[in-house]
Amino acid sequence: MISLSYFNDYGSFDFYLMPYFIERVFPGTKGRPRLAFEVDKNNVIFESSSKKNKVDVAIRYSTVIDDFDIGISHFYGNNRSPNLTFNNKSFKLDQYYPILSQTSLDLQSTKGAWLYKLEALLADNGGEKHFSIAGGTEYTIYGVRETSSDLGIVIEYTFDDRNDFAFNDEGVIALRWTQNDINSKSILAGLLSDLGGNSNRFFAEFEQRLNDDVKLFIDTSISGNIDQNDFT
């Protein structure tokens, strides 16, 4: 990858050139977790005639206006996530990498103990257009019970106009605890609920630095109910 950054009074510009594409690696028959069928790594199709040799490009502009951090990005190149199609002859999943053209916007503002965030994305994935948006707020209680710990209350909403998977219209409520110690110990736990159906899921994340070079992450997810009309 080749990157170039330019800064001026109006903000910063970042340019990226990615001259060689690396296919996504999927778990084999003995790998976990994996899909119900094996992904055929020998049957890969690209929309681009240049295939792996296509030069992908990306650009990002970011600036600060008053209390708002603003970023605008665009990417054009091979999609990093292939479309998987079942092959009736091999009983495996064939890979197809379409050309992805997507533009995104991100906003963030901090006002006292309140943090506000908004992200929006418009993409054309091999001719299939879709839109997604995510926004939310977090209120932080500093120095809980006169300690160094902070407690954040998180509320988020996300929407994706693709209806072929679960949690495409969801609300999230969570608590974030941060100890603010030398090990950067923190816990995030909450409930995710599909507002367009009956699906819900509990999640928890724990992280702690073990030493200067090693950090521990533990993620847990428990599905309470998955709507029969959702694909996961």
Predicted regions and their residues:
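Outer-membrane beta-barrel translocator domains and adjoining extracellular loop/strand segments
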Residues: 1, 26-32, 82-90, 128-132, ...
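Outer-membrane beta-barrel translocator/channel fold
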Residues: 1, 152-172, 193, 199, ...
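Surface-exposed coil loops of outer-membrane beta-barrel proteins
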Residues: 1-59, 232
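Residues on the lipid-exposed face of transmembrane beta-strands in outer-membrane beta-barrel proteins
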Residues: 2-6, 59-63, 105-109, 135-139, ...
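Residues that define the transmembrane beta-barrel architecture of outer-membrane proteins
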Residues: 7, 53-57, 99-103, 110, ...
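Transmembrane beta-strands of outer-membrane beta-barrel pores
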Residues: 8-10, 17-23, 65, 76-80, ...
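Short loop/turn motifs that connect adjacent beta-strands in outer-membrane beta-barrel proteins
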Residues: 10-12, 64-67, 127, 142-151, ...
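Transmembrane beta-strands of outer-membrane beta-barrel proteins
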Residues: 13-15, 70-72, 116-118, 149-155, ...
